Design a protein with these regions (language model features):
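Active-site rim/adjacent substrate-binding subdomains
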Residues: 1-67, 79-134
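Catalytic glutamate of the conserved HExxH
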Residues: 71, 75-79
């Protein structure tokens, strides 16, 4: 995992995805491309913009730790082949993110619940700690 600021993320996003500006998380799988045989035990790199993560956390009223955990899980799922290009893929990936976070004892950020098409249960919002964790 690599933590970067928005400027560095914008460069990576433009260079590797043709995107404009920063994004929250990028995944670079090692099992693809010219370095796939260097170390088959390494999945790849997950790059997270801490500035974008902080903005997301503030926008939903959550904590930075929960947001960073979500982005790390999201990136790892990309490394092992998950995507969210279609509605079905998105539902499956979001469900897996939620299950993984909960298995780690982390209450998924509100936006994961909202992505599932339902608001979070109010009692879960009140249980969250000061940094967004359950």
């Amino acid at each position: 995992m690599v933590l970067v600021d928005d400027d560095a993320m914008a460069v990576l996003n433009r260079t590797y995805r043709g995107g404009v500006g920063p994004t929250d998380v990028l995944a670079f799988p090692m099992l693809e491309g010219r370095f796939h045989d260097v170390s088959p035990d390494l999945l790849g790199d997950v790059v997270i913009s801490t500035e974008t993560a902080q903005r997301h956390a503030l926008a939903i009223g959550g904590g930075l730790r929960g947001e960073l955990a979500l982005l790390l899980v999201h990136g790892i799922l990309h490394l092992v082949g998950y995507d969210h290009g279609t509605a079905t893929e998105r539902r499956d990936m979001w469900r897996r993110q939620r299950l993984i976070l909960m298995a780690c004892g982390i209450q998924p950020p509100v936006r994961v619940c909202m992505a599932r098409g339902r608001p979070p249960r109010p009692e879960r919002l009140h249980r969250r700690g000061p940094d967004g964790d359950a």
